[in-house]
UniProtKB/Swiss-Prot annotation:
The gene is WHAMM. This is WASP homolog-associated protein with actin, membranes and microtubules. One of its GO terms (molecular function) is microtubule binding. Residues 638-659 have a biased composition (Pro residues). Interacts with ACTR3; indicative for an association with the ARP2/3 complex. Associates with microtubules; in vitro binds to tubulin heterodimer in a 1:1 stoichiometry; decorates microtubules with a repeat of 80 A along protofilaments. Interacts with RHOD (in GTP-bound form).
Amino acid sequence: MEDEQPDSLEGWVPVREGLFAEPERHRLRFLVAWNGAEGKFAVTCHDRTAQQRRLREGARLGPEPEPKPEAAVSPSSWAGLLSAAGLRGAHRQLAALWPPLERCFPRLPPELDVGGGGAWGLGLGLWALLWPTRAGPGEAALQELCGQLERYLGAAADGCGGATVRDALFPAEGGAADCESPREFRERALRARWVEADARLRQVIQGHGKANTMVALMNVYQEEDEAYQELVTVATMFFQYLLQPFRAMREVATLCKLDILKSLDEDDLGPRRVVALEKEAEEWTRRAEEAVVSIQDITVNYFKETVKALAGMQKEMEQDAKRFGQAAWATAIPRLEKLQLMLARETLQLMRAKELCLNHKRAEIQGKMEDLPEQEKNTNVVDELEIQFYEIQLELYEVKFEILKNEEILLTTQLDSLKRLIKEKQDEVVYYDPCENPEELKVIDCVVGLQDDKNLEVKELRRQCQQLESKRGRICAKRASLRSRKDQCKENHRFRLQQAEESIRYSRQHHSIQMKRDKIKEEEQKKKEWINQERQKTLQRLRSFKDKRLAQSVRNTSGSEPVAPNLPSDLSQQMCLPASHAVSVIHPSSRKTRGVPLSEAGNVKSPKCQNCHGNIPVQVFVPVGDQTHSKSSEELSLPPPPPPPPPPPPPPPPPPPPLRALSSSSQAATHQNLGFRAPVKDDQPRPLVCESPAERPRDSLESFSCPGSMDEVLASLRHGRAPLRKVEVPAVRPPHASINEHILAAIRQGVKLKKVHPDLGPNPSSKPTSNRRTSDLERSIKAALQRIKRVSADSEEDSDEQDPGQWDG
């Protein structure tokens, strides 16, 4: 009874292996310093041995070693804050283990204990004000004390061991170092038993070559079968132990989900509680699915181990068949057939477990695709998910081919066994002896009955062979159908990959074009900003110039400056007139103004200005669309108001001829100096148009970008003359204009109509862009799902799917 293994580990404490082994000596380096803010000693311990070992391993593995989990990497440095009382307590523990340390511990001043009570806070400060304590040791004394503590800790590590000193100074968090959790202990024990059974089986398999006779080989086969059974038993226990927490989680998650659904159906809950319960149900569903996935993965790993063991046994047995003759090997044929059946069954189980995993992945991708409109509005994600689905579907087809292959192996093995039995039955020889008595004939009748029974057995075996042949034919038909579906899936996968490559190439090409466009736009924006900055600088220079030269500009406008040589005398005098002189504006939109001769056009002038010398009325024709521009340019072109005019000059000469009578040469010079284009026809007025910079010489001071610009105003101020500007004159209404005439005038001018898009109703093109994108995304998702359903319509829908338990016989 004492040697029996306990069924439960209740009340047992698992102890780590090698607990009392001789520990490795580590070279420790201690650093001690006084922390005045905390009133404690800062102690640091470095394991030089572990650090050097780690450096050597890093140099051996290369520049990029594989990362290890944090739990597997032991620390090589420790640090902590210890008060004077804490150091005395650690000294008492270490001195109890090694008495020579008693005289090595340095004397700590009592003032350090007071400094270590900084945690008392305000209360200690008040007591310190009432009864001030003595000053602590100086800086040199503290450094000497820290050096003594370093030497003491080094001696303690040599005498008591580095692990003991570390535990005394830096208590480790967690459980005791000599114990481990029961689950880890049991898992480690089962894994060790499984590894041991696997090693024993491999050792037996390697001993086949030592058997020189068939009898010895059969003994090896028997020992091998026992080793395999032990391996299967231990592996089953180990993997069942691994499956236990996931099965418990699946059961708990399913029960909690059912309870929540029952509560939602039966209880009267508020909306917030309903939302919370629905989220909790989704969380339990997710946990159950994760547990199922883990169970499937562990199952796949178990069958991988059994298949690997059986494959090794079968391969070694096939090698043994080459060493013996056919008659001697006939005794081992049943075991070979049994191994083939076992390997086929285990492979079927492995492939079906893989099929479950792939089906879960496929369903997960399909669920992501169906829930995509609520997550991401991107068609490229749909294409990527579809490509992933095709890849998993191709893997699933490969698994199904393996399943059909192993099913066919099962059928072929059973057919070979039945054919061998039929041949043995047919090859049986019956010898008949001559009969001398009639009674012996009765015995012959019994023998004939036995012969008939043998024929019935042969017929039954042949019927079973026919059934297996029909199953084999159905498997071949399934394989052909599956191959066609696989080819279709490959074609779809190749087509989608080609589309993805084309879209990537197209996007890269257009991305480069868009980058060029963005670069050009950025350069244009920078150019505009630079122009605006230069314009602001010019305006600032103009303002400063006008402020400095205000007096001189006033004298120039009063006629003290010489006339510009490029203008005629009359026109130059006209440009030097004060701002009170009127300028008549003729709009080409007015029909009455077009019909009046140029000399008789309406111009507003004061009586005093009519008698002045050289007063020539200037008529500027402004189109209707330029009225706004004239308003904006008026602010820049107007010079400051001049002072009162000087005394009148001597009597003027006879009045000059009208503007129409000017010579063509003077008109050309005037238009050239003003920078305007001459009218095309003399009988029809034209608006003054600014010349382009390309049509004028760059070195001319009078030719600038447009009339009224900053450069032109600056040049005019320098030469003491004001440029012509467009002035908006309000249209003079007739004195007795009726409402009907206004209406008729508006009708003549016309009304600009807006382009109205007709409402097309339920036409999808009239929907917003977001709705169109959403509909396009939904259509692409539906089309992808339809293609996926066509591809995934495989042998699962067949009604004659064979049950794995059918091949157990």
